[in-house]
Amino acid sequence: NKPSRKVVAEDNGQSIEIVCTEALPFKTSTDNAPVYYYLENVMDAGTRLYGNGGLKYRAAENASAVNDVRNDLWYVTGNAFDGLQFHSVGTEDVAKSYAALSTSTSLTAGSHLLGYNDMWFVYRISDSTFGIHAYSGFNRKYLAWHMEDSKSEVTFGEPGKSDAFAFRMVEPTFTFPMYNGGDGNVYNTFAAPFDVALADDNVKMYKGSVNTAIHELTLSQVDAAPANAGVMLLGENSSANEVTLKAVSGVAALEGNSLVGITGELSDLTGKLILGISDQTGAVGFFTAGSSV
């Protein structure tokens, strides 16, 4: 917000306090408490920026695997007055340009640049979109992020308000399949290498405590799950074939949770309890070759 008032003759020699507040279309973070987003350019309904060993671009669609969602995440530190840093979780680095910022350089999120600029300022384009720019001492002007028509790189140009300059921070949601249990409910198990929370009301999330003596699983509802924790997803009286989740941070450990999260493929299922449907009773439960819970 820009405070203003008329300066009058009586102000001569007086100290005037000007209070400025920032109104950003996203929440800023600290390194210890990141607020995650997808970072998108609005061209063609959204071109997402993501880092996986470098700065790359793809259409705003679900990652091919849940584990890969982590590479899409961004968070922003700093403030509107001193400058902002855009952090790529995938590269564990910040978006940067060469120190001599010019229209012949491009944006990167890697650590290989010798001498670079990584502090940015934003300007309003719409209620939800903004431009990102920095002052170029080399060009003696501000230069802004600009998505190339090929969407293969972000370069720099004099600040504009077309879609090529318009970026937005989007809630980092993704979908995960649910399976019909034949009893009017839908089920699945879930684990991810990052903290997650539910983003819709179709399905509930549960931790599970196993009593091996009597082969009983007790479910307790939770709102979110920390990285690598196993949880049960259950939609009662539902035919939903997917659930929407979102990446978050700061989720505490699930006390008493017996469900083990596996984020890779298993080739040996010996001794593992797997969610399924009994071919004898049709009941949904966790099964091994010789027992069930």
Task: List the predicted regions and their residue ranges.
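Acidic, glycine-rich flexible loop segments
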Residues: 108-139, 266-292
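Extracellular glycan-recognition/adhesion modules and their associated mucin-like linkers
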Residues: 16-54, 68-104, 119-150, 159-173
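Short, flexible beta-strand-to-coil junctions
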Residues: 39-45, 87-94, 102-104, 134-139, ...
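Surface-exposed interfaces of beta-sheet-rich extracellular modules
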Residues: 1-5
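Short secondary-structure capping micro-motifs at structural edges
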Residues: 73-74, 82-85, 210-223, 227-230
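A short, surface-exposed interaction/processing loop segment used at functional sites
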Residues: 106-114, 150-160, 292-293
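Extended, compositionally biased repeat/scaffold regions that form elongated interaction surfaces
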Residues: 119-120, 196-215, 271-276
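A short, polar beta-strand/turn micro-motif
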Residues: 22-30, 169-199, 221-293
